[in-house]
Amino acid sequence: MFTFTDFARKWGLDTTPLEPVVKAHPFTLSRHFEGLIRGIGDPLWRQVVPDERELCDTSGMDDPLSEEDLSPAPNLVHRYPNRVLWLVNDRCAVHCRFCTRKRRWRTGPSTALEQDLGPALSYIAEDRRIQDVLLSGGDPLLLPIARLREILSRLREIGHVRIIRIGTRVPGALPRLITPEVAALLGRFHPIYVNIHFNHPAELSPEAVNACTLLANAGIPLGSQTVLLRGINDGPAVLGELFHRLLSLRVRPYYLMQMDLTKGTGHFRTPVATGLRVLRALRNRISGLAVPHFVIDLPGGHGKVALTPGMVRSIGQERMVIENYLGKLCSYPLLEGEEPELTEYLKGTSEQTY
């Protein structure tokens, strides 16, 4: 792993203006991912290298999805009745500068988090509504294999937990960790699903391809999650190539995510209409199997919504109103000047298009 000092020295960066950024939002980068960067300012660079604009964004929130408010046990988030999110560690192979959980970087990796499984497991065992557990973090696939085995085994001992999911960036950011042993371990706990974070075709290195192949050959259903990022992947050519290549690797594109409203990430955010426009273009370019859902995770913990005309109830100059999974009307802020294009787009798009 690179320290920021080592990375800056290698790339000839002046660290002085970036030191306050790194202090507020620490830097982590695997040597594998750094090796995929082809030049200063390229799409991979912009995802992981600190930017002074991270300290200038006052419009976002530390915890835009209200995960702390929805946490009934340490490191557990219970937003939907039959599903929970379990943050099993705080370590990542890279610190994505657009991360929703940037607030958790400040304390550094937590060893206590990895030692005390009891409260989360007890909560899951006691609430029989919970059928689906999503392991995230951090990154669960950075855990020692014995620890990962323990977590999966203990979840499988809970009869009402039917599905286990893992969210990870390891196959693309630190693929050497995906070994035959890891793939075989995960394959013992079916039904288990792995959703992999990929944002750009340049991340699909030969090593990443091999990691995905190992997992798929173990019979593990693979999906992908992609964040729509301004100037990085916000066009149909880039995303079309990414999604087509993922599908050929047996990784089903699952979500294209609108940027969360996290403090320090505003420079990555695209207009909502951009995502809608990109998906419309993709439907004419690639197989329907390769077209993901375009999703907004509503601020305040109101849940994910796949953006379709039927879910948008009204659009104003500064905000639109979206109906969430409970039928609740939720306000979502728009970028300045975004309203006319979004209104026009949704007006001309039928429900059946989706």
Predicted regions and their residues:
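Conserved, mostly hydrophobic/aromatic
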Residues: F33, C96, Y254
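N-terminal pre-triad scaffold of radical SAM enzymes
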Residues: P26, P72-R101
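Iron-sulfur (Fe-S) cluster-binding segments and ferredoxin-like electron-carrier domains
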Residues: C99-T111
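C-terminal accessory regions of radical SAM enzymes
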Residues: T28, L279-Y354
